[in-house]
């Protein structure tokens, strides 16, 4: 199944953070924080203004992005956890 985001939403796959401390202690999944970085998998066409114009999303597929810990809506597609996030919830593009 494929997702096509609407309006100013993007589909993001979380990037796994390192699950070890600097001293080599492995952090179990239950104690690990959700990563706040991800890769953009799909981009919606943009937000419609009051006069009917479309403002395109300023992201592209493949961008690595930063977002808030609780941003977006989680969805499971083909066994993979993805996020549907509004463009305004994305804090920065990692370059």
From Swiss-Prot:
GO terms for molecular function: ATP binding; metal ion binding; protein folding chaperone; protein-folding chaperone binding; unfolded protein binding. Gene3D superfamilies: GroES chaperonin. Pfam families: Cpn10 (PF00166). GO terms for biological process: chaperone cofactor-dependent protein refolding. The keyword Transmembrane does not apply. Disulfide bonds: none annotated. It is found in: Cytoplasm. Keywords: Chaperone, Cytoplasm. InterPro entries: Chaperonin_GroES (IPR020818), Chaperonin_GroES_sf (IPR037124), Chaprnonin_Cpn10_CS (IPR018369), GroES-like_sf (IPR011032). Heptamer of 7 subunits arranged in a ring. Interacts with the chaperonin GroEL. Belongs to the GroES chaperonin family. This is Co-chaperonin GroES. It comes from Bordetella avium (strain 197N).
């Amino acid at each position: 199944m494929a997702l096509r985001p609407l309006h100013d939403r993007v589909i993001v796959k979380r990037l796994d953070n390192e699950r070890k401390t600097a001293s080599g202690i492995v952090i179990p999944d239950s104690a690990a924080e959700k990563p706040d970085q991800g890769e953009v998998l799909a981009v919606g066409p943009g937000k419609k203004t009051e006069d009917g114009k479309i403002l395109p999303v300023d992201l592209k597929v493949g961008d690595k992005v930063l977002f808030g810990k609780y941003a977006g809506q989680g969805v499971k597609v083909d066994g993979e956890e993805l996020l549907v996030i509004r463009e305004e919830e994305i804090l920065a593009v990692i370059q």
